[in-house]
Amino acid sequence: MTKDVLHYDTVGSFLRPEKLKQARQEFLENKISREKLKLVENETIADLVEKEKQLGLKVVTDGEFRRSYWHLDTFWGFGGIEHTIPEHGYFFHGEETRADSATVSGKIHYVENHPDVQAFSYLKELIKDDDDVTARQSIPAPAQLYVELFRDEHNKKITNEFYPDHKKLVADISKAYRELILDLYNHGCRDIKLDDCTWGVIVDDDFWNVFSEDGKYTRDGLQDLYLKLNNGALVDLPEDLRITTHICRGNYHSTWASKGGYEPVAAHVFAKENVDAFYLEFDDERSGGFEPLRFVPKGKEVVLGIITSKKPELEDKEELKQRIKEAAKYVDLENLALSTQCGFASTEEGNKLTEEDQEAKIKLVIETAKEVWK
């Protein structure tokens, strides 16, 4: 694998096949064993990877088929974190998710054989004889775990009981994450993407007004905290490990959680986060314009999420090319790439598309990119 710019990509989660959905439900109802569920997961992941390769993707994922949520499953794999059921799920535009959370149960630390490492090991095995593709592992950003631990009054109370000194909390989260990243590396992973909704909350005035009510943070102060959490996990990593981040505004059942352009956070996250590339949502008016890209340091990559994963309708190819041209005013064209705005299934429910729609979106990404970057 090289760090050469690849001009087409996906965010990585894919619609769960009905066979997998049925098996997960049967497992929850104690009708099948965990071993049987794992066999179904393995089979459907193998089918997905073959499909990704057939479509022409050069970076493949397991579709997050072993996860229920894009973020919580990773949190639950750390020591000192437990799975809890809050009163409410996450609130999206016109919809509420299932109610699950992660709370502190002790000192947060990394535990060997983390579920994400197990998942990646199987993915790596599937492509071991194919030098033409790279296996990627997506994990939620360290800052996302911090936010979850202060998600509501219940979580805040428990977190403060275990961690009255928040500096120790920040240090433990970053350390646990760095050890996860290094363990993934030691198992052959050379491409890790941090999925991160924390910045999307800061840019949304409605979210920010609620979040800032306790007066503990200014917008700049919170951004400094998120950078410390994320960059703290990314220190002294191997040179041949590619680290990227996807900045998201929520993606559940084709709905969204937050809105706002990147301007309020661009000078922090674009200029200072220690990643190789930013996967950014620009699929509708909620995302604002490309002007904040002026803060991206020269040489870093930006993957333009201008093809929505929330709706089946296909974008006009010429309009996509024009938008790429507009973005190139702020980032060199050779450092730009194209992808869908988010994954197709950030949770196991998935967005309101068919697998055929999903495939058509990916084909549009690849075809458009090949015409732009000839």
Give each language-model segment a name.
Residues 1-374:
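Domain-level signal for soluble alpha/beta catalytic cores
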